[in-house]
């Protein structure tokens, strides 16, 4: 029985794109499901654009996502001799030929075909040159490329695991170039040679590669190699139905962007998995084990998926579904594991207290458990939750106007409440609430004026956990200090 072997072959010309990450994820899922192997192959033949920084970024991004590989990374440039040997084999067997047509002559023919509204394909000028004609051109020093000699047939077809039967008429397939005039084999050939060497049994990739697939199938056959199973995923588009790309969308399509903006790795994996696939029901959230069980190529959508990024949207910095998924995992993950992740954020912002890992460990975990319900990313713990871990928290403009500045008397009422809190021996939620409501009664105010004003003064926020859970979490000393200083909000 043939071993199931897949590959993820990124080009190191930039960061790891979320489209590439989705491709890697689908390959990883399929390999794991079928007890197969997944190979990481860096296709670095574009020496002008390939960089070590990009290679590191891709590997780091995959590692952060938890997409592990059984082999690699292999580098395509390390196997240049294999690619040249394959090209020579095709030339020697007559399945490839030297084409001496200049770029200028090809451009002229193309323009003439356009004007005549005829096929733009290569016309086969050099397909049947005699040995004497070839020798004459070589003697004259004429440069040439190698073209694959497409065999005569009615059509070429294959069964795509997602798109179904794909059939292309022979008349639509030109004799295509496989080696440049400088002797460098093209991606089309290199990719096939590498897949043959790596014994790849399944190729899962984007639909933008489908134009190459028919040609590559011909190369597999010409090289007497088994043809892998192909599965071409529809592309991911933006909400204007344009292909998402590094050039058009910038860092928002980089995996690193989500890591740096406080996403959990599995939350992004879950989002990417659902970006073009479903199990056929309404289920959205999958553990790793559940997704490994449910995933199938046949359930990948045949139509393009939409990445709902709205540039400049002040509320959602990326697709709202991605944010919602991250929020779900933050709310529901093991609190100890969350604590470790939040620790890194607090350390980065200078908010970490070593006591949180020692005598205040219970307080620390209880606090992040209390506040996580309204947070979307790990970054929120050091920004929206800053008041729990430091004194340099920001009082947001909206709650400041709504809860504080609207009531001039709070300039005196909140410090007064602070004094009453200072005298309490029992600083429980029940007792602090009683005192706050008692003060409101004395001042003939609705309790919400005092309570909401206090919330904004001591946390900077409009909403959050129960106010008196906040009071006891912050503790008597900090509550008294912040209430006494509340008058500064009116400055």
From Swiss-Prot:
Reaction(s) catalysed (UniProt annotation)? tRNA(Glu) + L-glutamate + ATP = L-glutamyl-tRNA(Glu) + AMP + diphosphate
Q: Where in the cell is it found?
A: Cytoplasm
Short name of one Pfam family for this protein? tRNA-synt_1c
Give GO MF terms, alphabetically.
ATP binding; glutamate-tRNA ligase activity; tRNA binding; zinc ion binding
**Keywords, in A-Z order:** Aminoacyl-tRNA synthetase, ATP-binding, Cytoplasm, Ligase, Nucleotide-binding, Protein biosynthesis
| EC identifiers of the protein | 6.1.1.17
Principal place where this protein is found? Answer: cytoplasm
Residues recorded as binding ATP, renumbered to this chain, are 246
Report the sequence similarity comment from the record.
Answer: Belongs to the class-I aminoacyl-tRNA synthetase family. Glutamate--tRNA ligase type 1 subfamily.
Positions occupied by motif 'KMSKS' region: 243-247
Give the top-level enzyme category. ligase
How is this protein annotated for GO cellular component? cytosol
**Alphabetical list of PANTHER family matching this protein:** GLUTAMATE--TRNA LIGASE (PTHR43311), GLUTAMATE--TRNA LIGASE, MITOCHONDRIAL-RELATED (PTHR43311:SF2)
Q: What is this protein called?
A: Glutamate--tRNA ligase
Q: What is the lineage of its organism?
A: Bacteria, Pseudomonadati, Thermodesulfobacteriota, Desulfobulbia, Desulfobulbales
Q: Motif 'HIGH' region: which ranges?
A: 10-20
């Amino acid at each position: 029985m043939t071993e199931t072997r897949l590959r993820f072959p990124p080009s190191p010309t930039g960061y790891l794109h979320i489209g590439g990450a989705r491709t890697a994820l689908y390959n990883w899922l399929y390999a794991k499901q079928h007890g197969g192997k997944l190979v990481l192959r860096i296709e670095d033949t574009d020496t002008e654009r390939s960089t070590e920084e990009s290679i590191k970024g891709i590997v780091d991004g995959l590692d952060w996502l938890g997409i592990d590989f059984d082999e690699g990374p292999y580098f395509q440039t390390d196997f240049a001799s294999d690619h040249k040997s394959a090209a020579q084999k095709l030339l020697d067997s007559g399945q490839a030929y030297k084409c001496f047509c200049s770029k200028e002559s090809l451009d002229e023919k193309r323009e003439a075909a356009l004007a005549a509204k005829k096929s733009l394909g290569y016309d086969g000028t050099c397909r049947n040159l005699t040995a004497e004609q070839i020798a004459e051109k070589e003697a004259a020093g004429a440069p040439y490329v190698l073209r694959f000699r497409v065999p005569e047939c009615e059509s070429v077809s294959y069964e795509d695991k997602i798109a179904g039967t794909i059939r292309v008429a022979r008349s639509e397939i030109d004799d295509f170039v496989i080696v440049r005039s400088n002797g460098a084999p093209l991606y089309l050939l290199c990719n096939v040679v590498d897949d043959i060497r790596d014994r790849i049994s399944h190729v899962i990739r984007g639909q933008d590669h489908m134009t190459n697939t028919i040609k590559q199938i011909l190369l597999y056959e010409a090289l007497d190699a088994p043809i892998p199973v192909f599965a071409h995923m529809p592309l991911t588009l933006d909400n204007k139905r344009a292909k998402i790309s590094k050039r058009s969308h910038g860092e928002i399509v980089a995996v690193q962007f989500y890591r740096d903006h406080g996403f959990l790795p599995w939350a992004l994996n879950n989002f990417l998995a659902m970006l073009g696939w479903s199990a056929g029901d309404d289920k959205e959230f999958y553990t790793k084990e559940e997704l490994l069980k449910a995933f199938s190529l046949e359930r990948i959508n045949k139509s393009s998926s939409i990445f709902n990024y709205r540039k400049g949207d002040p509320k959602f910095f990326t697709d709202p579904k991605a944010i919602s998924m991250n929020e779900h995992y933050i709310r529901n993950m093991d609190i100890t594991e969350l604590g470790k992740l939040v620790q890194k954020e607090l350390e980065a912002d200078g908010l970490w207290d070593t006591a949180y890992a020692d005598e205040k460990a219970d307080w620390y975990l209880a606090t992040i458990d209390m506040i996580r319900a309204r947070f979307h990313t790990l970054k929120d713990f050091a920004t929206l939750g800053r008041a729990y871990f430091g004194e340099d928290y920001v009082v947001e403009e909206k709650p400041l106007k709504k809860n504080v500045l609207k009531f001039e008397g709070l300039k005196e009422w909140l410090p007064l409440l602070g004094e009453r809190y200072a005298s309490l021996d029992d600083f429980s939620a029940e007792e602090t609430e009683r005192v706050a409501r008692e003060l409101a009664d004395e001042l003939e105010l609705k309790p919400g004026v005092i309570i909401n004003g206090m919330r904004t003064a001591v946390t900077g926020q409009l909403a959050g956990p129960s106010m008196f859970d906040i009071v006891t979490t912050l503790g008597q000393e900090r509550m008294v200090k912040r209430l006494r200083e509340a008058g500064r909000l009116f400055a």
